[in-house]
Amino acid sequence: IKSSAASDVYKRQTLDRRYFPNRGVSLEADYSLYTDNFVKYNGRSPFSAIGLKFMTVCPISSRLSLLPAFYGRVLIGGNTAFPFLNAIGGETFGRYLSQQLPFAGINHVEILDNSVVVARLQLRQRIAGNNYITLTGNYGIHNNDFFHLLEGKSLWGGSLGYAYNSIAGPLSATFGMSNRNSHLQFYMNLGFMF
């Protein structure tokens, strides 16, 4: 599949650190138009995607923080190519696919319907120096029709993890569960995420 995309991204970030921030807000909104000849896609109308990511850090004390987040992606048009479908899984945005949304409890990539929205809440405790424990819960909903999103299929999941903020980046181990798998999931990260 040969395609080209025209996109526009708005980013605003006031987080004090990239990893384990203590305060701040992150907001990103993006729009992409996908074509194969700058006019059409596969001889028909092009399709597009709208994305939104919001996260804030609410410090409860000098060691304990609450991190609510809300994010989603909507595909517009009926001719969406498989490589651009919505995907969830893992701990970070865009880990394996540029449009991948994180979801605690799902460590692999899953393809979802044309509209997906996720609400996530993390409770992070710094236990000593650069050591952190994070409890994450998230709920998502997806449907092919954005206007009937609330009638879509539900996703839920959660994880509990330990991380050390090293000079080589975060070293972490996480255990998670979701309604999309029947076994406890394990994820390990060794260093910076590129």
Model regions and ranges:
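Active-site lining segments that contact anionic ligands and/or coordinate catalytic metals
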Residues: 101-103, 114-118, 128-134, 155-159, ...
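C-terminal hydrophobic structural anchor segments
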Residues: 122-156
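Short small-residue beta-strand/loop micro-motif enriched in glycine and branched aliphatics
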Residues: 38, 144-145, 170-172
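Single conserved hydrophobic/aromatic residue that forms the stacking wall/gate
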Residues: 1-6
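Strand-connecting loop/turn motifs
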Residues: 24, 61-65, 128-132, 164-170, ...
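Transmembrane beta-strands of outer-membrane beta-barrel proteins
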Residues: 28-32, 69-73, 134-138, 163, ...
